[in-house]
């Protein structure tokens, strides 16, 4: 038997101030909305199609500087919330967002925290999610080639300005997208 120990990792912290306090401490009506939306998103994250991913070496969905890394501990208005589940790229509103690999659109929506959002199934439990979009340019069921435009960068949902949030889920576990990007090193 081989064993191993998983050690603790200290992630950097990010402190964000939001004017809309509902985005930090939602009222009961918004909590119900968030719960409904989370159920939809969990279903998307748990999608497993038999298609083999076209490539696990992914393109960046946008070209621009990284503004927030995966795993960053987040504090909104001084209150700790979930760690950052993806990568944020600081790019201007309206910048086209391209799918990093071929896939099928499995969910779109306008969500409380994520704003306009698109989920793409790349196959075998490998899912991309793009958030805070100003415009969604795809429909559920649409097949996309690598580099296909899913929408435009925006600042919808819990966002302090235009940026592109991208996360990867592998069999319903959020993983750092940076490990799948060619020569990109955050």
Which residues are covered by each model-predicted region?
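Catalytic cores of peptidoglycan-degrading enzymes
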Residues: 59-186
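Non-catalytic extracellular/periplasmic "stalk"
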Residues: 1-65, 69
């Amino acid at each position: 038997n081989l064993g191993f120990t998983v050690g603790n990792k200290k992630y950097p912290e990010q402190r964000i101030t939001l004017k809309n306090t509902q985005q930090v401490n939602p009222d009961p009506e918004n909590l119900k909305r968030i719960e409904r939306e989370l159920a939809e998103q969990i279903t998307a994250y748990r999608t497993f199609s038999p298609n083999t991913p076209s490539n696990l070496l992914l393109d960046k969905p946008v070209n621009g500087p990284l503004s927030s890394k995966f795993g960053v501990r987040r504090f909104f208005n001084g209150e700790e919330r979930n760690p950052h589940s993806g990568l944020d790229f600081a790019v201007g509103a309206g910048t086209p967002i391209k799918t990093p690999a071929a896939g099928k659109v499995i969910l779109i929506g306008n969500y409380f925290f994520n704003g306009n959002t698109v989920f793409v199934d790349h196959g075998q439990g490998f899912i991309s999610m793009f958030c805070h979009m100003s415009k969604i340019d795809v429909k559920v069921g649409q097949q996309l080639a690598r580099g296909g435009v899913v929408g435009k960068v925006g600042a919808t949902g819990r966002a302090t300005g235009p940026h592109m949030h991208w996360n990867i889920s592998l069999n319903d576990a959020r993983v750092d997208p940076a490990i799948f990007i060619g020569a990109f090193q955050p």
